[in-house]
Amino acid sequence: MSSAPHIPVLGREAIDHLAPREGGIYVDATFGAGGYSRAILDVPGTRLIAIDRDRTAIAGGAELVERSAGRLTLVEDRFSHLADVCAAQGVDAVDGVVMDVGVSSMQLDQAGRGFSFRLDGPLDMRMGQAGPTAADVVARASEADLADIIYLLGEERHSRRVARAIVADRQETPFTTTRALADLVGRVVRSKPGDIHPATRTFQALRIFVNEELEELQTALTAAERVLKPGGRLVVVSFHSLEDRIVKNFLAERSKTGGGSRHLPEVAQTAPSFQLLTRRPVVAGEDEVAHNPRARSAKLRAAERTSAPAHKDDQSSSWPRLSDVMRGG
């Protein structure tokens, strides 16, 4: 199974922490090019449910499905739906969940997908084929909403300046290509030699917003909590601070005892649903970064499910919501 050339970021470390065993049932929540899936299937007798919302990734995995002799089920869906996907396959509990969140190298390298400011293509950015594109958001969102999106999801301190320029320019010519938007941001955000590309944060913000990536991640983590068996493992690789903060806070909350107090003994305590396997995030070594610069920002966190019930789901957030912005546009 391991003959494919694709090697995922922190692939060895992810599989070491997942620790797949013979006969176990696992979920690769973000199939992509199938790197984690191949490593899991290398363990004899494993059963794997792999998920991806990108139809191109699903098509690319057809050969692996055929070679797996019934051990791999590949499903086109959002990874936030992993509990429902498992239930549809007759699986109510699994031994491990691994997820590599964010945009994939394959998606970035395809100009037609519109993810990259370095390649000219349609301003799309959708991981799936449904919903508004980045061009739709840029065309319809108010200046205030655009500024919030770019600031909160891209951590761009010049967000208001960028939003103002977008709204001014779109009245003359709609933004339909990645190059047009990247050029505008490049004129508005000044950079020095050695800085990241001026459009990096704006493109990140629009991509996260269009795909609802932070909401997806939060929901996927709680879904994994529900389907993991006691002793089952959750492994998450993230690529920027917003994602890592969500994973870190989720695991910190789920790995501590909460709710009770010696002053209020009648308040029931919530037992930890996870035990941390990584007190600090695992990062890529120098050799991996040299071969794959994208690995520089990767952080891996892992935890093991306890026998305690899943915690109450709290989905509150302060992020701009796609449905709200597009409804008001």
From Swiss-Prot:
The keyword Glycosyltransferase does not apply. GO terms for cellular component: cytoplasm. Its main location: cytoplasm. Gene3D superfamilies: Putative methyltransferase TM0872, insert domain, Vaccinia Virus protein VP39. One of its GO terms (biological process) is rRNA base methylation. GO terms for molecular function: rRNA (cytosine-N4-)-methyltransferase activity. S-adenosyl-L-methionine binds at residues 34-36, 52, 79, 100, 107. Keywords: Cytoplasm, Methyltransferase, rRNA processing, S-adenosyl-L-methionine, Transferase. Its EC number is 2.1.1.199. It catalyses: cytidine(1402) in 16S rRNA + S-adenosyl-L-methionine = N(4)-methylcytidine(1402) in 16S rRNA + S-adenosyl-L-homocysteine + H(+). It is found in: Cytoplasm. Residues 285-329 are annotated as: Disordered. The keyword S-adenosyl-L-methionine applies. InterPro entries: RsmH, SAM-dep_MeTrfase_MraW_recog, SAM-dependent_MTases_sf. It comes from the Bacteria. Belongs to the methyltransferase superfamily. RsmH family. Specifically methylates the N4 position of cytidine in position 1402 (C1402) of 16S rRNA. This is Ribosomal RNA small subunit methyltransferase H. It comes from Bradyrhizobium diazoefficiens (strain JCM 10833 / BCRC 13528 / IAM 13628 / NBRC 14792 / USDA 110).
